[in-house]
Design a protein with these regions (language model features):
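Membrane-integrated ABC transporters
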Residues: 1-32, 39, 47-59, 68, ...
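Juxtamembrane loop-to-helix connectors within ABC transporter transmembrane domains
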Residues: 2, 11, 43, 80-81, ...
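An intracellular "coupling" helix at the cytosolic face of ABC transporter transmembrane type-1 domains
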Residues: 13, 104-105, 123-130, 134, ...
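Transmembrane helices of ABC transporter permease
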Residues: 13, 17-30, 61, 65, ...
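Hydrophobic alpha-helical transmembrane bundles that constitute the permease/transmembrane domains
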Residues: 26-37, 66-74, 126-129, 133-145, ...
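Short intracellular "coupling" helices and adjacent cytoplasmic loop segments at the cytosolic face
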Residues: 49, 85, 93-125, 196-220, ...
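Helix-loop-helix
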Residues: 50-53, 150-167, 234, 238-307, ...
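ABC-type nucleotide-binding domain
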Residues: 321-322, 328-572
Length: 572
């Protein structure tokens, strides 16, 4: 199915309004066809016969026709805008919904700004094309068909002469249409590049200022801006060439009409009024053809944008639920990794033959040098990625056999990079459990040592924290994230450097809260600072994607291996 047909499918739910809009459009277009026919009667009947009554009748009729035309124009404009906007809303929501359920791998391979451009620039390009082009197409086609019908009624030979130019127009539109689609695609790509640079620089403004790289970033933006300018001008060049070519072909046709029509009037085969009306219709015929060429160009722009939009909707996610996936019921937290291997691509093995048995309620610390696979191993547990070999079990249930939602509901995560949303402190904590009460939210904040600093703020829990929590300190952001995880009350916890952003006093209080939270829950803790995991039930030491040591703190020190070396290095 081509992209144009796919776009039409989005309009199907609104087909009733669409048909009504087309009806009003056709009636409004008929009003344009009325004037030349009346002009014929004015010349051939009113002026020739000096018929005052007919003149008055025509005058009143013109007013009535244009009054009706105005009502129809309003109705068709409103209805087409409604349908167009609804179609755009549906497409934008479909793209956003698809993005929400794509795997992490999709986002890691693309710039954030490029992904944003799909929802903003590309869907926005469809918006103008769908609303304007659909309305204009029906209007111009109505005028085109109506004009041809009336022209054949006036003089069929002249009408056939008019149609000779049609194949030339169609060929020109086809040739230029292909160029427009190509240049429009490049134009959308350049717009996406600008969005990507803009998103990256705004989100990294503190780094830019700290390195005094404002001029460097301006130069980057100017480069992309001019690349976009060149793409826009290339597209404009093609559009600017198309219209004069169509006009030239139409002008040649009209010239033949005047020449041949004049002979017919001189020979008495056609009245002067009929020739004037015919020429007006022929001119009207040229205008729709010219406008249709412009509409065709806009449609090609829309198809270039649609191609990018549908590329998102057609994207296959790496993480797929089985058709018969079941709900993961309440768990106690036993976790088993059995011969698990993972790699991002064929040549890059990240985890190799991981075997790990964790009892319910145990605290498992994961340590090792950078790049050892510590974060990757815990990312497999909520199925952010799937292993290429082996299986992972929770309470002896293969996590690949259960629904993603029921699996992830059982797991709480405090990531290394704190992510908060623009809104209030209360809403950010509530994100952990949207059904929680105010008392439960406050209890979670107290457990994370966040309640006191929240109450010191002017708006307390309703304090707006800004984008990504920019109005809070690093330690405050971390504690809000921990409170959010506490509120979720999961059976399995993943703590990735969970207290690394806190000051000494807050770290102690939060660590105490986490220690209490982890009681009775299975916890995976990634920590570079070994002082935070000395009491772990099990410490696994990773190197180059493999578990090289495993045991308690005391057991690993006795081995005098990698862990012992890391411990001595930190506590020297």
């Amino acid at each position: 199915m081509n992209n144009y047909k796919r776009l039409l499918l989005y309009a199907k739910p609104y087909s009733g309004r669409l048909m009504l809009a087309f009806l009003f459009t056709s009636v409004a277009a008929a009003g344009n066809l009325f004037v030349p026919w009346i002009l014929k009667d004015v010349i051939d009947k009113v002026l020739m016969n000096k018929d005052i009554f007919l003149l008055n009748t025509i005058a009143v009729t013109i007013v009535i026709v244009f009054f009706i035309r105005g009502i129809c124009f309003y109705a068709q404009t409103y209805l087409m805008s409604y349908v167009g906007q609804k179609v755009i809303i549906d497409i934008r929501e479909a793209v956003y919904r698809k993005l929400q359920f794509l795997s992490l791998g999709y986002f890691e391979k693309r710039q954030t700004g490029t992904i944003m451009s799909y929802v903003t620039n590309d869907v926005g390009a469809l918006q103008g094309s769908i609303i304007e082009s659909a309305t204009d197409f029906v209007t111009e086609m109505s005028i085109l068909i109506g004009s041809l019908a009336l022209m054949f009624n006036l003089h069929w030979k002249l009408s056939l002469l008019t149609l000779i130019t049609m194949p030339l127009v169609a060929k020109a539109m086809d040739l230029f249409g292909k160029k427009l689609k190509r240049t429009s695609g490049i134009m959308q790509d350049r717009a996406a590049d600008i969005t990507a640079v803009l998103q990256e620089t705004i989100s990294s403004v503190r780094v830019i200022k700290s390195f005094v790289r404002e001029e460097y970033e301006i130069a980057r933006f100017v480069k992309e801006n001019y690349a976009n300018f060149r793409a826009q001008m290339k597209n404009a060049q093609v559009m600017a060439t198309l219209t004069p070519v169509i006009e030239l072909i139409a002008a040649i046709g009209v010239t033949f009409l005047i020449w041949y029509g004049g002979f017919e009037v001189i020979n008495g085969n056609l009245t002067a009024g009929a020739l004037i009306a015919f020429l007006v219709y022929a001119t009207n015929l040229a205008n729709p053809i010219k406008r249709l060429s412009r509409i065709y160009g806009n449609i090609q722009k829309a198809m270039a944008a649609a191609e990018r939009v549908f590329s998102v909707l057609d994207e296959k996610t790496d993480i797929v639920e089985k058709e018969n996936a079941t709900e993961l019921k309440a768990v106690i937290g036993k976790v088993d990794f059995k011969a698990v291997t993972f790699k991002y691509n064929e040549n890059e093995v990240i985890l190799k033959d991981i075997n790990l048995a964790v009892k319910a309620g145990q605290m498992v610390a994961i340590v090792g040098p950078s790049g050892a696979g510590k974060t990757t191993i815990v990312n497999l547990l909520p199925r952010f990625y799937d292993p290429v070999a082996g299986n992972i079990y929770i309470d002896d249930v293969n996590i690949a056999d259960v629904t993603l939602a029921s699996l992830r509901e059982k797991i709480g995560i405090v990531p290394q990079e704190t992510v908060l949303f623009n809104g209030s402190i209360y809403d950010n904590i509530l994100y952990g459990d949207l059904t929680a009460t105010t008392e439960e939210v406050m209890a979670a904040a107290k457990a994370a040592n966040a309640h006191d600093f929240i109450m010191q703020m002017a708006d307390q829990y309703q304090t707006q924290i800004g984008e990504r929590g920019s109005k809070l300190s690093g330690g405050q952001r971390q504690r809000i994230a921990i409170a959010r995880a506490i509120l979720k009350n999961p059976r399995i916890l993943i703590l990735d450097e969970a207290t690394s952003a806190l000051d000494t006093e807050s770290e102690k209080l939060v660590q105490d809260a986490l220690d209490k939270l982890m009681v009775g829950r299975t916890s995976f803790v990634i920590a570079h600072r070994l002082s935070t995991i000395l009491q772990a039930d099990m410490i696994i030491v990773m190197e180059k994607g493999q578990i090289v040591e495993q045991g308690s703190h005391e057991e690993l020190l006795k081995l005098d291996g990698l862990y012992s070396g890391l411990y001595k290095l930190q506590f020297k």
